[in-house]
């Protein structure tokens, strides 16, 4: 079974999650962040998936629906939305979220539980992870990446990994050098062990998953690391979100992330193809269905339904769904949320390390 935490680390991209969950943050022209963990699970044969929601999950439910787009609309197993009970946001952290969906965990008949958030963009084959877990006889297998910890990553866990792959040490939010093994927030564990560990933490009023569940039990459990060397970007800041979208301009990244043998599924919206005016010019950009381009677009990501007026120049921008840009505008290093209107002849300039953000439904 799989469990996806749709609200984790929302504070890192507060501009984008003010009215939506982390899981429903748009990405890559037509996707949402939750599409990547959900598709990876489905492609790996996981047919029972629970999505833990804490708040602002209306857009998430609209996107997921019955799970039909991921072949999870079925009589047995399928997709389950797990909102908080009693109208409250529930206990804090991943442990609190697991405690709130304890009935779902106990009801499942699956042997293993795969836990992950929505803030890491990657396309993982979890069959390889399960094979590694069984081969090592691990109680817990954590997915990690070797390299420099992303800047502004929330409470990063850094592991000390032995030659056999066993985790012998764990530091949280250290001043770690490059080349360390840091956590991607993905974990495989036996379902019955997870229920026991969560119950033990809750009974002691301990709600930090990394400190209280993992770090505290590191000596008594067999914890192994699975190093993922493919493309993975953690959305831990607005700049990181911008950079992750810009990374899609690289054909090698697109080929790996959107591997036809492990497709990324999403909700299908019936739109007309993108339309280009006589004076339009588009280079090195991702332009989604439904766009109307009459100006110049360079090195940018345009989501569905975006309109670019005549003589408008868009460079190094991420323009979300149904936004309208008037004529004669100049935009460079701008992140624009949904349904924004930019009037004629406006000039908006940011920088690669500090892109300008325009909030949802704003008029500039």
Protein language model regions, located:
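Left-handed beta-helix
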Residues: 1-6, 192-193, 200-364
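Unchanged
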Residues: 1-247, 358
């Amino acid at each position: 079974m799989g469990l996806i935490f749709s609200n984790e680390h929302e504070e890192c991209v507060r501009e984008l999650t003010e009215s939506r969950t982390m899981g429903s943050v748009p990405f890559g022209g037509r996707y949402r962040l939750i599409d990547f963990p959900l598709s990876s699970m489905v492609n790996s044969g996981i047919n029972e998936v629970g999505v833990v929601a804490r708040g602002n999950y209306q857009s998430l439910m609209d996107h997921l629906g019955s799970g039909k787009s991921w072949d999870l609309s079925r009589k047995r197993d399928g997709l389950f939305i797990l909102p908080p009970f009693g109208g409250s946001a529930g206990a804090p952290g991943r442990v609190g979220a697991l405690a709130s969906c304890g009935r779902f965990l106990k009801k499942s008949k699956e042997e293993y539980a795969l836990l992950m958030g929505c803030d890491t963009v990657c396309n993982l084959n979890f069959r390889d992870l399960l094979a590694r877990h069984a081969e090592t006889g691990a109680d817990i297998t954590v997915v990690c990446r070797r390299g420099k910890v992303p800047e502004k990553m929330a409470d990063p866990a850094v592991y000390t990994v032995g030659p056999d792959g066993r985790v012998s040490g764990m530091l949280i939010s250290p001043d770690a050098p490059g080349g360390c093994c840091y956590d991607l927030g993905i974990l495989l564990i036996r379902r019955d062990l997870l229920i026991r560990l969560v119950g033990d933490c809750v009974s002691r009023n301990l709600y930090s998953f990394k400190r209280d569940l993992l770090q505290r039990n590191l000596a008594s459990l067999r914890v192994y690391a699975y190093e993922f060397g493919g493309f993975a970007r953690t959305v831990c800041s607005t700049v990181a979100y911008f950079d992750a979208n810009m990374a899609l301009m690289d054909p090698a990244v697109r080929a790996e992330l959107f591997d036809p043998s492990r497709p990324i599924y999403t909700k299908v919206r019936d739109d007309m193809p993108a339309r280009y005016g006589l004076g339009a010019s588009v280079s090195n950009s991702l332009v989604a269905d439904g766009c109307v381009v009459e100006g110049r677009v360079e090195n940018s990501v345009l989501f569905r339904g975006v309109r670019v007026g005549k003589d408008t120049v868009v460079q190094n921008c991420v323009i979300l769904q149904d936004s309208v840009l008037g004529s004669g505008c100049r935009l460079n290093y701008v992140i624009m949320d949904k349904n924004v209107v930019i009037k004629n002849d406006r000039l908006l300039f940011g920088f690669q390390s500090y892109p300008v953000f325009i909030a949802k439904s704003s008029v500039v």
